[in-house]
Structures are given as structure tokens and as C-alpha cells.
Regions:
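Conserved HGGG/HGGXW glycine-rich cap/lid loop of the alpha/beta-hydrolase fold
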Residues: 36-89
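Conserved loop-alpha-helix segment in the C-terminal half of the alpha/beta-hydrolase fold
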Residues: 71, 225-251
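Active-site loop/oxyanion-hole signature of alpha/beta-hydrolase fold enzymes
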Residues: 81-116
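Gly/Ala-rich beta-loop-alpha elbow adjacent to hydrolase catalytic centers
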Residues: 120-124, 128
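Flexible "cap/lid" loop of the alpha/beta hydrolase fold
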Residues: 129-134, 142-170
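Active-site nucleophile elbow and catalytic-triad environment of alpha/beta-hydrolase enzymes
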Residues: 184-211, 225-229
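Short beta-strand/loop motif that positions the catalytic acidic residue
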Residues: 215, 221-223
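Catalytic active-site module of serine/aspartate enzymes centered on a nucleophile-bearing elbow/loop
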Residues: 249-280
Length: 280
């Protein structure tokens, strides 16, 4: 049975609950099958595992721990967040390159994690999509932050875009910050590369097609209203058997997750509640 919940969240908390009391995460490394050394952080002592995958040009510490997301999850779950290859403290065989989906599977194998919740932001969401295609049986739930899956059909893409066009766009400082971010990402990417969330793991061979209608994995998407949310989620809404679409009013690709600072409590609350609702 399809369950769809569209959530518009309006309250803003300045600090996540328990943010200041969070202990330092554990820091470790493992070596991927191609010899690349991958850094990862862990938190929490009990409960099901949650795997967190950060975005392009970021790190596990900044995106998940500094924001308060990982500490909130670690109250009732075990959390692991990797620095994608080419990022953070992991090896950088391709400077300014993207992450690799197989690194996530190999990290789970290294830690003997049979199944886990998974959540990725931006590029991390692209990697999450690949993981659902490669090994859906390994995941309890899947989360797309600042991301989703675009429609392959041109007519369906246009329909989703028309829905986004009805939403207001960012203005002033928010719009200027997004322009600076796009310019920084464009300058960092190799020539000819597309957006990181659409090319999350070029080193992953033979990724099978993803047919969400054949999966039973509950899926959540969390996007700002200024971040073209319907273009990212229309396919998820059509195909996923269980899908929750969370749209944060007045948030951009940058402010929806507040990288490097306290996280908007709305994102944390939606993510934690969803994971707990389908934990098994």
C-alpha cells in the first residue's frame, strides 16, 4: 500500500536538542578494495545502524556531527558517517572528484553491518540512489536530503518542473549565497562534469537500473522549497511504495541543512521520526 505524507514544516529552533552535550565521535579508517583509505566517524552504543553520506566538497564531521544530526540519531541508534573518497580525511585519488557507492557497501561489510538505514545529502543522495540499485536488501529505509531522483521521461520532468515554477524562489542574501556556491562547485569540478548529485560514483561499474516500484524500502526526501523539490521527488512519489516528502519552506540547498553550524531542528525531527517509524 502506498503511503504518502507531504509535510510542510514551519518552526525553526536555533539549537538541536542536546546539541552542546554530544560527545566526540569515534574516528577510524578502513581500506577499500581498490586500496583507497576511507575515514569514518561513529557514534551511539545501541540500536539499528544509520549510515550517513555527505555532499560534494564537504565532510562527515561538518555535515552530520557539527550540525547535530548524528548526535540526535545516536541517542537511539548506532551511527556511521564516512568521508567520501576525495573528501575530508579520506584519500583523494581524484582531487575534486566525487564519492563511490561501493565504498559504502565495503564500509558496512568492514563493520559487519548486515542492514542499516541510509541517508545522503546532495551528492550523498545520488550515492543513495545507486545503493538502492546495487544492494536494496542492505537498507531498512533510505533518505534523500537536498536530492532525489529525477524523471527520465521528458514529459514527466516538465510536469514536475511546472510544480516547482509555482513556488517562490530565493531572494537577496539566500540567492547570492546559492550563486556563490554554484560558482565554487563549478570551479572545483573536473571539466565537463555534471552536477555532483547526478554523478555520485563514477568509479562504480555496471550499476543496474533502479526500479523503485519493485522495492519495499521506505523512502523520505527532505528538500528546501527554494531547491526545486518537486523535480527531485516526483519520481519518488510515483514509484516508491512508501514515500514521505518533506519540504522546508524558505530553505535553499544550503540552508536546509545548515552545514558547519547548528541544524534546523525541522530536518532532524523529520529524519529521526521517519527512521524510528520504520525501524525493524
Amino acid at each position: 500500500m502506498k503511503i504518502i505524507a507531504l509535510v510542510f514544516i514551519t518552526m525553526l529552533a536555533l539549537l538541536p536538542k542536546g546539541f552542546a552535550q554530544a560527545p566526540a565521535p569515534g574516528s577510524s579508517f578502513f581500506t577499500a578494495s581498490d586500496g583507497v583509505k576511507i575515514h569514518y566517524l561513529t557514534a551511539g552504543n545501541s540500536g539499528s545502524w544509520v549510515v550517513l553520506i555527505h555532499g560534494y566538497m564537504d565532510s562527515a564531521q561538518r555535515m552530520w556531527f557539527t550540525t547535530g544530526i548524528a548526535p540526535a540519531l545516536a541517542k537511539t541508534h548506532r551511527v556511521v558517517a564516512l568521508d567520501n573518497r576525495n573528501h575530508g580525511q579520506s584519500d583523494k585519488p581524484q582531487p575534486n572528484g566525487t564519492g563511490r557507492a561501493l565504498d559504502v557497501i565495503e564500509l558496512m561489510d568492514h563493520l559487519k553491518i548486515q542492514r542499516a538505514h541510509i541517508h545522503g545529502y546532495s551528492m550523498g543522495g545520488g550515492i543513495t540512489g545507486q545503493l538502492l540499485a546495487i544492494a536494496p536488501e542492505r537498507f531498512i529505509t533510505a533518505g534523500f536530503g537536498g536530492s532525489g531522483l529525477t524523471e527520465a521521461d521528458a514529459d514527466l520532468r516538465a510536469k514536475a518542473a511546472a510544480m516547482d515554477d509555482k513556488l517562490p524562489g530565493p531572494e537577496g542574501a539566500d540567492a547570492q549565497a546559492m550563486e556563490r556556491f554554484r560558482a565554487r562547485v563549478t570551479a572545483a569540478r573536473p571539466a565537463g562534469a555534471t552536477a555532483p548529485e547526478t554523478t555520485p560514483a563514477a568509479a562504480t561499474p555496471a550499476t543496474p537500473p533502479l526500479d523503485l516500484s519493485r522495492l519495499s524500502v521506505p523512502i523520505i526526501a527532505i528538500n528546501g522549497s527554494f531547491d526545486r523539490p518537486y523535480s527531485k521527488t516526483h519520481r519518488l512519489w510515483r514509484e516508491a511504495s512508501v514515500f514521505q516528502n518533506v519540504i522546508l519552506p524558505g530553505k535553499t540547498h544550503l540552508t536546509a541543512i545548515a552545514v558547519g553550524g547548528p541544524m534546523p531542528q525541522q530536518y532532524i525531527d523529520a529524519m529521526v521520526k521517519f527512521i524510528d517509524s520504520y525501524d525493524k
